[in-house]
């Protein structure tokens, strides 16, 4: 069937236009709801016995789990399109099955604020790890006041407990809803 007003069109053209208007143009308002992810590798580490290592093809910090003086640091800036936090997770893998005991500290703030205007701390945390399997440690509760443009410093350290094997620290995954 051909249409002649306002210009000549075929039924296929009208159906395509209707689908475009309904499913693409009208739904563009929801694009801001998409969750974005940012991968943050470790920056540096401190402690005797710590070294750079590998887990498969991943570069890692190999943390010998029997010393409380082992620290791995992360630093990053929160993206400008950040609207709200969907999750902050540390990706690790253990060389042996163990219960890992750890502490996490964080300080963050924006330009013009003190470096520790927002702080978070979790001490004597534990997580059961299975040998050679990825594990995500949820750190979301430590950055509850996170905002676009904030500069974040975060460190992971062994707590007082005895841990077996080696923990490979791979990186942080920041998940957020964008503006």
Regions found by a protein language model. Name each.
Residues 64-85:
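Short beta-strands within extracellular/lumenal beta-sheet-rich domains
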Residues 81-84, 96-98, 162-166:
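A short beta-turn/strand-edge loop motif at beta-sheet boundaries
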Residues 83-94, 172:
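A short beta-strand element within beta-rich, extracytoplasmic domains
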Residues 91-93, 105-109, 175-177:
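Predominantly extracellular/luminal cell-surface or secreted proteins
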Residues 97-139:
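Terminal beta-strand-rich extracellular "head" domains
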Residues 38-49:
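N-terminal targeting leaders for non-cytosolic proteins
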Residues 155-163:
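Short beta-strand-plus-loop segments that form exposed binding edges in beta-rich domains
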Residues 1-36, 50-57, 73-77, 101, ...:
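Extracellular "spike/adhesin" assembly and maturation modules
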């Amino acid at each position: 069937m051909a249409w002649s007003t306002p210009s000549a069109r075929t039924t296929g053209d009208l159906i395509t236009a209707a689908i475009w208007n309904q499913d693409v143009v009208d739904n563009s308002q929801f694009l801001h709801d998409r969750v974005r992810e940012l991968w943050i590798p470790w920056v540096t580490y401190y402690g005797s016995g710590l070294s750079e290592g590998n887990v498969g093809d991943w570069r890692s910090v190999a943390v010998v789990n029997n010393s409380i003086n082992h620290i791995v640091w992360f630093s990053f800036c929160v993206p400008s399109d950040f609207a709200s936090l969907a999750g902050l997770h540390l990706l690790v893998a253990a060389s042996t099955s163990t219960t890992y005991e750890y502490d996490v500290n964080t300080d963050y703030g924006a330009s013009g604020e003190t470096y520790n205007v927002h702080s978070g701390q979790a001490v004597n945390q534990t997580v059961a790890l299975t040998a050679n399997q990825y594990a995500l440690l949820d750190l979301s509760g430590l950055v509850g006041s996170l905002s676009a443009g904030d500069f974040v410093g975060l460190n992971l350290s062994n707590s007082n407990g005895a841990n077996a094997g080696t923990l490979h620290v791979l990186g942080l995954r920041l998940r957020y809803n964008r503006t």
